[in-house]
A protein has these predicted regions:
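Alpha/beta-hydrolase-fold enzymes
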Residues: 57-106, 234, 238-239, 253, ...
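Short beta-strand element of the alpha/beta-hydrolase
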Residues: 163-174
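Short alpha-helix in the alpha/beta-hydrolase fold that links the catalytic acid
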Residues: 414-424, 435
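Alpha/beta-hydrolase active-site loop
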Residues: 212-236
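Amphipathic, low-complexity, repeat-rich surface-exposed segments
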Residues: 1-150, 163-164, 201, 270, ...
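Short amphipathic alpha-helix adjacent to the substrate-entry channel of hydrolases
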Residues: 182-200
Length: 522
């Protein structure tokens, strides 16, 4: 390794840059100014150092987990030292400083002084007022038709004269507020489906407090998914199946529910639940053997540390959780952002997705421990050892058609990990690999620029294909994947009928409900 590093350094001094194209894959070095001397050598030297430490971090005798952890922290240190982060070594910043006669540097210094003095960033503190829930975001008309201790269930009003009989039930992750699926009117997935003639129900998780410390994964399954399904069945009519969709951990919970409902004996305590017609899983993992960088922070010692943190307060706070996600994506969420704020004077312009991301939620202590231990640490769902009501469930019992979406730059649910459902169940799977990341790749409405996706269908009980092989063979499409999904849902639905003008049952208030508005000062 040392010999190769020396050789690369000599080549760099001679103007030879092996793998020149690699720089184009790193957004920090895409600007044409990085091609000029001496910045091209700084860039190449940094790439050589990255390659060296990727290999040097491998220590014989270490477990795979600790080996990956060592590489991760080496990557973090290198990311901090990248030439793009510093005034004297970033040609884009230097050019900007000259063109603006230093005014952007002065503005950046003011931004830095504001941050270090502890004065809240006005761009962040103004988000709740700029993007008000129910006024600017989460505005799709509807009614709250059910409420318990843990959830509210929203039924959106029809926007077409006729609708498909089978409703679509949307289950977001409990880690964040549901309105990621109902952002602004132009990019609301719920509004889009309603506009295409679907009856849509949305699950809204309550933001827990210390009194919820003992809530379990089974509680989230029963009071969340099962109770909501029962209400949907009552309102839709006897014998009408449901298209169920889950996003992130909501999708993981949906697969648990589907497997439990399909096993012999079903789920105790549930009344006349409707059957599931199809499953849609968005950035949802079911096999956690390779969960990406998030898995680096999940082992016995880390879970013990988290348990100590949550034991006293009864929950994991939204601030604690948000810090972990920032650390995972430090290049874009920390260093590149700070470079633009402090060296170029550019504060990020607020948008609806930023407002949603800042609207954090808590997780009950016991449930948080159970989901980390059973899913991430023991990978119980993939090994058919996850227990519901003291009996195991197996994903091999799922036979409904599945529409599954992974995203290319997802650091929370890596697409290759999402793809592993192919070897866990024999159902027909339509797999979509969308451009973008965990959130932006999912909220990819028609008309959004620079969007594309690949897709292919694995027939029921079809042969296994490795992810890389799939990516080489799957057809590429320009634009949003939403229309393809909607067409898939429509094809699996009965012909449209006249929409009901009134919601069956008692209305508990207008959408988006009460639970989504609960915030805590943390």
């Amino acid at each position: 390794m040392a010999v190769r590093l020396a050789k690369d350094t000599m080549n760099m001094q001679d103007g030879i840059e092996d793998g020149e194209g690699a720089a184009d894959d790193d957004p920090r070095f895409r600007h044409e100014a990085w091609a000029a001397w001496p910045f091209s050598q700084l860039r190449t030297g940094f790439r050589n150092a990255e390659a060296f430490w990727r290999e040097a971090a491998h220590v014989p005798g270490m477990t795979a987990h600790h080996d990956a952890l060592t590489q991760f922290f080496a990557k973090q240190i290198l990311g901090m030292m990248a030439p793009a982060n510093w005034l004297a070594s970033n040609p884009v910043v230097l050019r900007d400083a000259m063109e603006t006669h230093g005014s952007h540097l002065l503005k950046g210094a003011q931004n830095w002084l504001t941050d270090v003095s502890g004065v809240p960033n006005p761009e962040v503190t103004s988000l709740p007022n700029r993007f008000v829930v129910g006024r600017d975001v989460a505005t799709t008309p509807g009614k709250v038709v059910y409420r318990n201790r843990l959830i509210e269930l929203i039924r959106y009003e029809p926007q077409t004269a006729k609708v498909h009989p089978e409703p679509v039930f949307m289950i977001p992750s409990w880690i964040m507020k549901f309105y990621i699926l109902d952002l602004s009117p132009h990019n609301s997935m719920a509004r889009y489906l309603v506009g295409q003639g679907h009856t849509v129900y949305m699950l809204s998780w309550r933001n827990p407090d210390a009194s919820d410390a003992r809530l379990t994964m089974d509680d989230y399954l029963h009071m969340g998914v099962m109770d909501a399904l029962e209400v949907i069945g009552q309102q839709s009519g006897k014998g009408v199946p449901v298209h169920a969709m889950g996003y992130c951990l909501g999708g993981t919970l949906l697969t648990i529910a589907a497997a439990a409902m399909a096993r012999t004996g079903g789920v105790a305590g549930t009344r006349n639940l409707p059957s599931l017609k199809t499953l849609t899983l968005l950035a949802a993992q079911t096999d956690f053997s390779e969960p990406g960088e998030l898995g680096l922070f999940i082992d016995e010692s880390q879970i013990g540390l988290l348990d100590n943190m949550t034991r006293g307060q009864g929950y994991l706070s939204g601030k604690q959780m948000a810090g972990s996600f920032q650390f995972l994506h430090s290049r874009d969420l920390i260093w590149t952002r700070r470079m633009r704020e402090y060296l170029m004077g550019e504060r990020e312009q607020p948008n609806d997705l930023m407002a949603w991301n800042a609207d954090t939620t808590r997780m009950p202590a016991r449930m948080h421990h159970e989901y980390l231990t059973s899913l991430y640490l023991h990978n119980a769902l993939a090994t058919s050892s996850y227990r519901v009501e003291d009996h195991t469930v197996s994903l091999s019992d799922i036979h409904q058609p599945v529409f599954m979406v992974g995203t290319q730059r997802d650091h929370i649910s890596p697409w290759r990990s999402v793809y592993k459902l192919h070897h866990l169940c024999g159902a027909e799977i339509t797999f979509v690999l969308a451009s973008g990341g965990h959130n932006a790749g999912i909220i990819s409405e028609p008309g959004h620029p620079h969007r594309s996706f690949q897709s292919a269908i694995r027939p029921a009980y079809g042969p296994w294909m490795e992810p890389e092989q799939w990516a080489k063979q799957a057809k590429t499409h320009e634009g949003s994947w939403w229309p393809a999904w909607q067409q898939w849902l429509a094809k699996s639905s009965s012909p449209k009928k006249l929409a009901r003008t009134k919601t069956a049952g008692t209305s508990l208030g207008e959408a988006p409900g009460e639970y989504v508005r609960v915030r805590y000062a943390e």
